[in-house]
Amino acid sequence: MGLPIEAKDSEISKKMIIFVVILSLKTNNMDNSVKRVLFVNSEIFPYLPESPIANIGRYLPQGIQERKKEIRSFMPRYGCINERKNQLHEVIRLSGMNIVINDVDRPLVITVASISSARMQVHFIDNDDYFHRKSIYRDDK
């Protein structure tokens, strides 16, 4: 089930829709249900400058995690995100797969970094064809 959250960024005058996918998986005890959350956002602070969208991307997952839910946060790895400064490293078990988009086989590379103050990990979807640009929402060539 997707829960749309709408946020406006006055600087770029666009509406962005953020979807939180909540997956309910059964545990060994059939009476209990563990909630696992997959959070995918276009911006997460501190990896991109503060904005309404980046702040939602930063603090909403932390709030969900503090309520004892298991959460995974994902965002694109734009060219402006510094791998060394943010201590990104590749997640071998998630990388190495391919994704087919419009009949073109593309490699999937996932990197991860931590927000230590929140004890939270952020996974980055890395693909040069789609995200390797200095600007977030437009391709400045």
Predicted regions and their residues:
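Nucleotide-activated donor-dependent transferases that construct or modify glycoconjugates
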Residues: D31-E50, M75-R77
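Residue-level detector of structural "landmarks"
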Residues: G2-A7
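Short, positively charged and aromatic/hydrophobic N-terminal segments
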Residues: D9-E11, I18-K26
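A short, Lys/Arg-enriched amphipathic alpha-helix followed by its capping loop at the start of a domain
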Residues: Y59-K69
